[in-house]
Amino acid sequence: MQFELNAQARTLQGTGASRRLRHAAKVPGIVYGGAAAPQSIEVDHNDLLLKLKKEAFHSSIINLIIDGKKEQVLLRDTQVHAYKPLVLHVDFQRVDATHELHVKVPLHFVNEEVAPGVKLNGGLVNHVMTEVDIQCLAGDLPEFIEVDLSSLKIGGSIHLSQLKLPKGVKIVHHTADDSVVVGIVGKGGASEEAAEGEAAAAE
């Protein structure tokens, strides 16, 4: 999915200037990275807020148009109000085609309802992770990674090493362990063996 966001260069700095921007429905921000110097910007609040509600915006290359000049960036951070739907600040990082990115992308779980552990044994899906760190070139960046649960039984789980990754995408491991991504557990914590025993007794 392609996203485009218009911005203007920002020259005034400081708390007072940022407050005036917010009163004018603008969000102060910064663009950094690459060979160019960091640049302060301002973007329309409502436009940014609408885009932030879209999951793909957080893990897609964004065409940021600053005073008519296009740069490709990633959303890196947002500061939001504690209880109001207000964006207070936004950070973007420049990207290029030749340098690998390190970014979090969401996991999309499919076929949960037909997984044997759920459909046949009434198990519960336990989502241990909802996103994963990946490394890839900008052109290979996926909006999400799909996790198929169609063959998962009670007590079964899917680990990071079992994820089907798009071409050019690598998982960034933070520990030596092959962490669990998702599993199916019995309603009473039943193991796979116990569930199979109950099924055999029923037959």
UniProtKB/Swiss-Prot annotation:
GO terms for biological process: translation. One of its GO terms (molecular function) is 5S rRNA binding. Signal peptide: none annotated. The keyword Ribosomal protein applies. Disulfide bonds: none annotated. The keyword Ribosomal protein applies. GO terms for cellular component: cytosolic large ribosomal subunit. Keywords: Ribonucleoprotein, Ribosomal protein, RNA-binding, rRNA-binding. InterPro entries: Rbsml_bL25/Gln-tRNA_synth_N (IPR020056), Ribosomal_bL25/Gln-tRNA_synth (IPR011035), Ribosomal_bL25_b-dom (IPR020057), Ribosomal_bL25_C (IPR037121), Ribosomal_bL25_long (IPR001021), Ribosomal_bL25_short (IPR020055), Ribosomal_L25_dom (IPR029751), Ribosomal_uL5_bac-type (IPR020930). This is one of the proteins that binds to the 5S RNA in the ribosome where it forms part of the central protuberance. Part of the 50S ribosomal subunit; part of the 5S rRNA/L5/L18/L25 subcomplex. Contacts the 5S rRNA. Binds to the 5S rRNA independently of L5 and L18. NCBIfam families: bL25_bact_ctc (TIGR00731), PRK05618.1-2 (NF004128), PRK05618.1-5 (NF004130), PRK05943.1 (NF004612). Belongs to the bacterial ribosomal protein bL25 family. CTC subfamily. PANTHER family: RIBOSOMAL PROTEIN L25/GLN-TRNA SYNTHETASE, ANTI-CODON-BINDING DOMAIN-CONTAINING PROTEIN, RIBOSOMAL PROTEIN L25_GLN-TRNA SYNTHETASE, ANTI-CODON-BINDING DOMAIN-CONTAINING PROTEIN. This is Large ribosomal subunit protein bL25. It comes from Dechloromonas aromatica (strain RCB).
